[in-house]
């Protein structure tokens, strides 16, 4: 790695440390976003049908469970 020349050598070293911290935070945010998306996908996959049944059972007129589950 090349060393910076001139009076700003300490400032350049501090900037390198800041860039490292920003990179770590960026990586953390990316991993957290991926984890959140995976969990949301699973929740949506297993929760959609029960949600539809619950909404249907609370509607007026109240249908029977067989009417909710039948495609017709």
UniProtKB/Swiss-Prot annotation:
GO biological process, alphabetically ordered: protein import into mitochondrial matrix
Keywords, sorted A to Z: Membrane, Mitochondrion, Mitochondrion outer membrane, Protein transport, Transmembrane, Transmembrane helix, Transport
Locations listed in the record: Mitochondrion outer membrane
Entry annotated with the keyword Transport: yes
Ranges in the topological domain labelled Cytoplasmic: 2-41
GO CC aspect terms: mitochondrial outer membrane translocase complex
Bilayer topology term: Single-pass membrane protein
Pfam families tied to this protein: Tom7
TM region positions: 42-59
Main location: mitochondrion
Parts of the chain on the Mitochondrial intermembrane side: 60-72
Assembly notes: Forms part of the preprotein translocase complex of the outer mitochondrial membrane (TOM complex).
Function: Seems to act as a modulator of the dynamics of the mitochondrial protein transport machinery. Seems to promote the dissociation of subunits of the outer membrane translocase.
PANTHER family: MITOCHONDRIAL IMPORT RECEPTOR SUBUNIT TOM7
Family in the record: Belongs to the Tom7 family.
Protein name: Mitochondrial import receptor subunit TOM7-1
Organism: Solanum tuberosum
Lineage: Eukaryota, Viridiplantae, Streptophyta, Embryophyta, Tracheophyta
């Amino acid at each position: 790695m090349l060393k910076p020349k001139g009076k700003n050598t300490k400032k350049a070293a501090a900037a390198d440390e800041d860039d490292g911290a920003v990179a770590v935070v960026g990586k953390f945010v990316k991993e957290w976003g991926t984890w959140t998306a995976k969990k949301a996908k699973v929740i949506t996959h297993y929760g959609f049908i029960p949600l539809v049944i619950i909404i249907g059972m609370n509607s007026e007129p109240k249908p029977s469970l067989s009417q909710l589950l039948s495609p017709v």
